Amino acid sequence: EFDGLVENELHRSNPAIRVGIQQRRAISIVPEVLQRFMEKYPDVEVIFRDGNQAELMKMFQEGSVDYIISVCSEEIPDVVRTEIARERVLLALPEHHPAIAHAYQVGNEPYPHLDLRYLDRETFIIPMAGQSMRMTVNRIFQQARIRPGRLIEIGHFDVIMSMVNIGLGIGFNRLGYIHDMQKFEHVRYFFVDHDAYR
Protein backbone atom coordinates (compact mmCIF):
# COMPACT_ATOMS: atom_id res chain seq x y z
CA GLU A 1 0.00 0.00 0.00
CA PHE A 2 2.84 2.39 0.82
CA ASP A 3 4.54 1.82 -2.53
CA GLY A 4 1.18 2.34 -4.24
CA LEU A 5 0.70 5.70 -2.54
CA VAL A 6 4.21 6.81 -3.47
CA GLU A 7 3.74 5.66 -7.09
CA ASN A 8 0.52 7.72 -7.28
CA GLU A 9 2.38 10.73 -5.92
CA LEU A 10 5.13 10.39 -8.54
CA HIS A 11 2.59 11.31 -11.23
CA ARG A 12 1.74 14.64 -9.57
CA SER A 13 3.55 17.88 -10.26
CA ASN A 14 4.77 18.23 -6.64
CA PRO A 15 4.80 14.70 -5.20
CA ALA A 16 4.70 14.52 -1.40
CA ILE A 17 3.63 12.22 1.42
CA ARG A 18 2.73 13.39 4.89
CA VAL A 19 3.92 11.34 7.84
CA GLY A 20 2.87 11.84 11.44
CA ILE A 21 5.37 10.70 14.05
CA GLN A 22 5.59 10.75 17.83
CA GLN A 23 7.77 13.56 19.14
CA ARG A 24 10.07 11.27 21.11
CA ARG A 25 10.46 8.80 18.23
CA ALA A 26 11.22 11.52 15.71
CA ILE A 27 14.71 11.97 17.16
CA SER A 28 15.87 8.51 16.18
CA ILE A 29 13.52 7.51 13.36
CA VAL A 30 13.23 10.56 11.09
CA PRO A 31 16.89 10.76 9.99
CA GLU A 32 17.07 7.06 9.14
CA VAL A 33 13.67 6.88 7.45
CA LEU A 34 14.25 10.06 5.48
CA GLN A 35 17.66 8.92 4.26
CA ARG A 36 16.30 5.59 3.00
CA PHE A 37 13.23 7.19 1.48
CA MET A 38 15.25 9.84 -0.36
CA GLU A 39 17.48 7.14 -1.83
CA LYS A 40 14.48 5.18 -3.13
CA TYR A 41 12.21 8.12 -4.06
CA PRO A 42 14.39 11.19 -4.64
CA ASP A 43 11.56 13.13 -6.32
CA VAL A 44 8.99 12.75 -3.53
CA GLU A 45 8.94 15.25 -0.69
CA VAL A 46 8.34 13.90 2.81
CA ILE A 47 6.50 16.21 5.18
CA PHE A 48 6.80 15.20 8.84
CA ARG A 49 4.33 16.30 11.47
CA ASP A 50 4.97 15.42 15.07
CA GLY A 51 2.69 15.07 18.05
CA ASN A 52 1.63 12.73 20.80
CA GLN A 53 -0.47 9.63 20.17
CA ALA A 54 -3.83 11.41 20.49
CA GLU A 55 -2.73 14.25 18.21
CA LEU A 56 -1.44 11.81 15.59
CA MET A 57 -4.69 9.86 15.58
CA LYS A 58 -6.62 13.10 15.10
CA MET A 59 -4.35 14.15 12.20
CA PHE A 60 -4.80 10.76 10.57
CA GLN A 61 -8.58 10.73 10.99
CA GLU A 62 -8.83 14.27 9.60
CA GLY A 63 -6.64 13.35 6.61
CA SER A 64 -3.83 15.78 7.37
CA VAL A 65 -1.28 12.92 7.34
CA ASP A 66 -1.11 9.86 5.09
CA TYR A 67 0.75 7.64 7.56
CA ILE A 68 1.61 7.62 11.23
CA ILE A 69 4.58 6.01 12.93
CA SER A 70 3.73 5.41 16.55
CA VAL A 71 3.30 3.02 19.40
CA CYS A 72 -0.22 1.77 18.91
CA SER A 73 -1.71 -1.15 20.80
CA GLU A 74 -5.33 -0.73 19.83
CA GLU A 75 -6.89 -1.67 16.51
CA ILE A 76 -8.11 1.16 14.30
CA PRO A 77 -11.07 0.32 12.05
CA ASP A 78 -10.46 0.38 8.28
CA VAL A 79 -6.73 1.04 8.68
CA VAL A 80 -3.88 -1.07 7.37
CA ARG A 81 -1.41 -1.49 10.19
CA THR A 82 2.11 -2.86 9.94
CA GLU A 83 3.96 -3.79 13.11
CA ILE A 84 7.56 -2.66 12.81
CA ALA A 85 8.73 -3.91 16.20
CA ARG A 86 7.68 -4.68 19.74
CA GLU A 87 9.33 -2.67 22.42
CA ARG A 88 9.60 -3.61 26.07
CA VAL A 89 8.44 -1.28 28.78
CA LEU A 90 10.75 -0.68 31.71
CA LEU A 91 9.95 0.33 35.25
CA ALA A 92 12.34 3.04 36.49
CA LEU A 93 13.13 3.26 40.20
CA PRO A 94 15.54 5.40 42.21
CA GLU A 95 18.62 3.29 42.96
CA HIS A 96 17.93 2.93 46.70
CA HIS A 97 14.22 2.13 46.52
CA PRO A 98 13.37 -0.71 48.97
CA ALA A 99 11.34 -2.64 46.35
CA ILE A 100 14.56 -3.37 44.46
CA ALA A 101 15.24 -6.09 47.04
CA HIS A 102 12.37 -8.06 45.43
CA ALA A 103 13.78 -7.94 41.89
CA TYR A 104 14.64 -11.23 40.21
CA GLN A 105 16.52 -12.25 37.10
CA VAL A 106 14.81 -14.13 34.25
CA GLY A 107 17.18 -16.02 31.97
CA ASN A 108 19.68 -13.84 30.17
CA GLU A 109 17.48 -10.77 29.99
CA PRO A 110 19.36 -7.47 30.29
CA TYR A 111 17.26 -6.19 33.18
CA PRO A 112 15.79 -7.94 36.20
CA HIS A 113 12.02 -8.21 36.70
CA LEU A 114 10.02 -6.59 39.47
CA ASP A 115 6.46 -7.35 40.48
CA LEU A 116 4.41 -4.17 40.64
CA ARG A 117 2.61 -5.38 43.76
CA TYR A 118 5.58 -4.06 45.73
CA LEU A 119 4.81 -0.56 44.45
CA ASP A 120 1.15 -0.18 45.43
CA ARG A 121 0.40 3.31 46.81
CA GLU A 122 3.76 4.69 45.66
CA THR A 123 4.29 8.02 43.88
CA PHE A 124 4.45 7.53 40.11
CA ILE A 125 5.69 10.10 37.62
CA ILE A 126 3.92 9.39 34.36
CA PRO A 127 3.38 10.92 30.90
CA MET A 128 0.42 13.16 30.14
CA ALA A 129 -2.91 11.88 28.87
CA GLY A 130 -2.75 11.40 25.10
CA GLN A 131 0.81 10.09 25.08
CA SER A 132 1.18 6.44 24.05
CA MET A 133 3.20 5.60 27.16
CA ARG A 134 0.39 6.96 29.33
CA MET A 135 -2.00 4.53 27.66
CA THR A 136 0.48 1.74 28.34
CA VAL A 137 0.95 2.82 31.97
CA ASN A 138 -2.80 2.90 32.53
CA ARG A 139 -3.06 -0.65 31.16
CA ILE A 140 -0.16 -1.82 33.36
CA PHE A 141 -1.77 -0.32 36.48
CA GLN A 142 -5.06 -2.00 35.64
CA GLN A 143 -3.50 -5.40 34.93
CA ALA A 144 -1.35 -5.28 38.06
CA ARG A 145 -4.30 -4.06 40.14
CA ILE A 146 -2.31 -1.42 41.90
CA ARG A 147 -3.28 2.13 42.75
CA PRO A 148 -0.68 4.85 42.86
CA GLY A 149 -0.59 6.86 46.05
CA ARG A 150 0.17 9.96 44.03
CA LEU A 151 0.45 10.70 40.31
CA ILE A 152 2.69 13.40 38.91
CA GLU A 153 2.11 14.06 35.20
CA ILE A 154 4.97 15.32 33.04
CA GLY A 155 5.07 15.36 29.23
CA HIS A 156 8.80 14.74 28.72
CA PHE A 157 10.64 11.49 29.41
CA ASP A 158 13.89 13.26 30.25
CA VAL A 159 12.13 15.25 32.96
CA ILE A 160 10.44 12.12 34.29
CA MET A 161 13.77 10.27 34.48
CA SER A 162 15.48 13.27 36.11
CA MET A 163 12.79 13.21 38.81
CA VAL A 164 13.22 9.45 39.32
CA ASN A 165 16.98 10.03 39.40
CA ILE A 166 16.68 12.23 42.50
CA GLY A 167 14.14 9.98 44.21
CA LEU A 168 10.89 11.89 43.67
CA GLY A 169 8.99 8.84 42.47
CA ILE A 170 8.81 5.88 40.11
CA GLY A 171 8.51 6.11 36.34
CA PHE A 172 8.23 4.04 33.20
CA ASN A 173 10.38 4.14 30.10
CA ARG A 174 10.75 2.28 26.83
CA LEU A 175 13.75 0.13 26.09
CA GLY A 176 14.43 2.13 22.93
CA TYR A 177 14.57 5.43 24.80
CA ILE A 178 17.09 4.65 27.51
CA HIS A 179 20.24 4.68 25.37
CA ASP A 180 19.89 8.49 25.28
CA MET A 181 19.45 8.68 29.06
CA GLN A 182 22.75 7.46 30.46
CA LYS A 183 23.14 10.72 32.39
CA PHE A 184 20.59 9.51 34.94
CA GLU A 185 23.07 7.50 36.99
CA HIS A 186 20.76 6.81 39.93
CA VAL A 187 17.91 5.22 37.94
CA ARG A 188 17.56 1.43 37.95
CA TYR A 189 15.49 -0.28 35.28
CA PHE A 190 13.33 -3.40 35.58
CA PHE A 191 11.07 -5.32 33.29
CA VAL A 192 7.50 -5.30 34.55
CA ASP A 193 6.47 -8.63 33.07
CA HIS A 194 6.73 -10.63 29.87
CA ASP A 195 3.64 -9.00 28.36
CA ALA A 196 4.44 -5.35 29.04
CA TYR A 197 5.00 -4.31 25.46
CA ARG A 198 3.90 -1.21 23.58
Predicted regions and their residues:
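N-terminal winged-helix
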Residues: 4, 8-41, 45-58, 73
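Short, well-ordered beta-strand segments
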Residues: 16-20, 68, 125, 171
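Short beta-strand-centered segments that line the small-molecule binding cleft or hinge
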Residues: 32-36, 53-96, 100-104, 160, ...
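Hydrophobic hinge/microswitch elements
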Residues: 52-56, 61-64, 71, 132-190
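Secondary-structure junction motif
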Residues: 101, 107-144
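Periplasmic-binding protein-like
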Residues: 193-198
